[in-house]
Amino acid sequence: MLTIESSLERRRFAIGDVHGCSRTLQKMVENVLQLKPDDTLYLLGDYIDRGPDSIGVLDYLLKLRESGFDIRPLRGNHEEMLLYAVADPTSRNMWYGNGGWGTLKQLGIDSPEAIPQRYIGFLNSLPYLIITEDYVFVHAGLDFQADNPLQDTPPQFMLWSRDRLVNPSNIGNRTLVTGHTVMPLFAIQGSLSTHHITLDNGCYDKGELSCGALVALNLDTRELLVQENIERQT
């Protein structure tokens, strides 16, 4: 059964893929957004892998939640790969090849089964989809070939799709907000006037032309907020 959240008188933000950039995320939340407990923050998945501090990202999200902040994190394909690697040893190589081995090294362990239950429980709790009155949040996309994309899109499509097709009339004229596919800042900015806003600028890939920043969106004003990658600054 789908749950549609009501928007109250509070600020609402969404943040794209973080990928292990814990210092950048913290600066975005505390200095750029200046997040307050009565704000709502949606996160689009892919908190782990590729960047230098995946566990720091998870710890920070858990700390925000435990401190009473209203955060609504989604599941990304990297979280799903980790969970599959824990449940099925034959799935490990796929995760390892997408940054998972580096995440294990950050934990100081060499097997997915040794990942602390604190993190496994958190990742298992993450939904694939969040629907509000005016937005639909999903990591990668929805299947607009389906009769009802909100009901009929398979989870793997939500996590892995790179299909740019969007038909807003099939999702209640809401705007779809996704991460997953790295886009240059000018393309992200251009998406703000459409029914499909993309927020992945490849935060982990510092130095890439027009990429390498963490991107957030004020959902009420459609203002784009950008924090450059600061992971390697001393």
Regions found by a protein language model. Give the residues of each.
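N-terminal active-site segment of His-dependent metallophosphoesterases
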Residues: 1-59
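His/acidic metal-ligating clusters that form di-metal
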Residues: 115-186
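Active-site neighborhood of divalent metal-dependent phosphoester bond hydrolases
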Residues: 50-133, 158-166
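Conserved beta-sheet core of the metallophosphoesterase superfamily
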Residues: 154-228
